[in-house]
Structures are given as C-alpha cells and as structure tokens.
Amino acid sequence: MIQRRRPSSGLWKIVVWDEPFFQGKRHEFTTDCYSTPERGFSTVRSFRIESGAWVGFEHCGFQGQQFVLERGEYPCWEAWSGSNAYHVDRMSSFRPITCAVHGRSQLLLFEQENFQGRRGELSDDCPSLPALGWGGSAVGSFLVCSGAWVCSQYPGYRGFQYLLESDTHAGEYKHVREWGSHAQTGQVQSIRRVQQ
C-alpha cells in the first residue's frame, strides 16, 4: 500500500456529477475517493476542479487508466481523455496530487530500468523528447527529485498518461510496472510538470 500525506481541506476541491455535462447527482470532495460506488455514485461522468491538481482513475482503488486533472471543467469524457486511443467514459476513483509544486520541479530520466544507461534531466516541460535529442521512444526508469510530472506516450502530451510524484515510491520509478496499473510499455515521448 502506498503511504501518502493526507491533504488538508481547502487546498484541494473537486465537484463531481454522475452524468455528463454537470447533470444528475452532485457531490464535493476535498480528499481521496477510493471508490465512487462506496460514496453513492455508480461512476463520475463530469466534474469541475476548483482547486489543486487531481488524478482520476478508470477503476476503483486508484487502478486502470489515469488522467491528470488540473483546474477547470470536464463536462464529458473527451475533455479528460483527449486524444487517447483508449476510450474511458467514466472515473471510479480519484485523489489530490499533493506534491505538485510547479515552480520547483526536477525529474531525472534513464534509458534503462533501475536508473541505468543514458541519463537526462528536466526542470521544465518537454513537448517532444525526440526533438530534445532523446534517442528512441522508450524510457526505462525515472527519479522524481521534486514536484509531480505527467508523462505522455506521444509528442505533444498525447496518448496514455503516467503520473510520477516525488512523494510516491520516494520518487523512484525503477521499472514501467511502477508507473501505474495500466502501464504496458516504456514509450514516453513528452513530459510536463503538473500545474497546481
């Protein structure tokens, strides 16, 4: 089980609805929701992030495809899944991203798992790793020195998303399996800091 700091209320707020376009049953959260069915929602189909950054998951228990959610409105699934080839029309769990400190973020990426091979360092957003000179489309491991980062499968922040946090796994992501339950490949071609 991942140990994580409990956020204090006021810093994070999400308002959810069980139907698209802010219709149906409504509820506000300021902390983790491990399972929407346990909170009286079969699923969440639209939401508004009022404060903080959040990560939503396809399945209960923070499992499945993940989506980084920053301040704004998400009226339907296209708003949060964007250009993903994998259609996810609902969220079944979500939590705040407590370590998102946009101004002081640092990430080390490695060509191979267990922090081996060629190394790169980022402290700013990178819409295209290949354009930056990173050979190939795969990354083997990450060390998050500070902040929270979202890695995307393709350039331009498209495709599957993988959230990397400095306060999870002590910031160490030694293998693709640690990027999330849906991670199947080390294909990462763009990386950006999470906006708080």
From Swiss-Prot:
Keywords recorded for this protein, A-Z: Eye lens protein, Repeat
Q: Which Pfam families match?
A: Crystall
UniProt region (Connecting peptide), positions on chain: 99-104
Beta/gamma crystallin 'Greek key' domain mapped to chain residues: 12-51, 52-98, 105-146, 147-195
The record's region (N-terminal arm) falls at 1-11
Q: Name one GO molecular function term.
A: structural constituent of eye lens
Q: Which residues form a coiled coil?
A: none
Q: What is known of its domains?
A: Has a two-domain beta-structure, folded into four very similar Greek key motifs.
- Subunit structure, as described in the record: Homo/heterodimer, or complexes of higher-order. The structure of beta-crystallin oligomers seems to be stabilized through interactions between the N-terminal arms.
UniProt similarity note: Belongs to the beta/gamma-crystallin family.
Q: What does this protein do?
A: Crystallins are the dominant structural components of the vertebrate eye lens.
Record's protein name: Beta-crystallin A4
Query: In which organism is this protein found?
Result: Gallus gallus
* Recorded name of the encoding gene: CRYBA4
